[in-house]
Amino acid sequence: MKIRKAEKKDIPRILALLGQVLQIHAEIRPDIFIPGTTKYTPCELAELLEQEDHPIYVAVDEDDLCMGYAFCQLREQPFSTNMVPFKSLFIDDLCVDKQTRGQHIGESLFEYVKQQAKELGCYEVTLNVWAGNTSAEHFYEKMGMKTKERQM
């Protein structure tokens, strides 16, 4: 397995994985998520691949098939009267194909994102988890993440 930046050839597999994530969210929150859809269209995903401040990393197998991804956003907090300026790398979405879970691909992707954040001069890596997504909560806690804010 290797991890690299996503390319246009990865779009079909990324869309399939986005569908897996959306299904989980639709089961947790059927009042707002629509099963059988994805967060992005192929065109939107192609545009996203061009944005330097929205890197998408993919874990690929020996045949260069995408087994998982991490959608990220580089965020900058400018100086204000109450906060020092800093950069963070926000994980907008992380998924490993349900057929390849349990092979430490998610851990590898997460560690890769942390390394990229360090190389980009980021102060921290952040993310959101939907309430009820206990497997994601446990995964991120295992990776050392701690809750620092709750939205209600």
How should each PLM-predicted stretch be described?
Residues 58, 65-74, 95:
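Conserved beta-strand in the GNAT
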Residues 43-58:
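A short helix-loop-beta-strand connector motif used in the catalytic cores of GNAT acetyltransferases and
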Residues 23-45:
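Conserved GNAT-fold acetyl-CoA-binding loop/helix
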Residues 118-128:
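Conserved GNAT acetyl-CoA-binding A-motif
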Residues 2-17:
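A short beta-loop-alpha structural element at the N-terminal edge
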Residues 60, 76, 92-101:
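A short, internal acetyl-CoA/4′-phosphopantetheine-binding micro-motif in the GNAT/acyltransferase core
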Residues 59, 102-110, 117:
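Glycine-rich acyl-CoA binding loop
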Residues 107, 111, 119, 131-149:
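Conserved active-site alpha-helix within GNAT-family acetyltransferase domains
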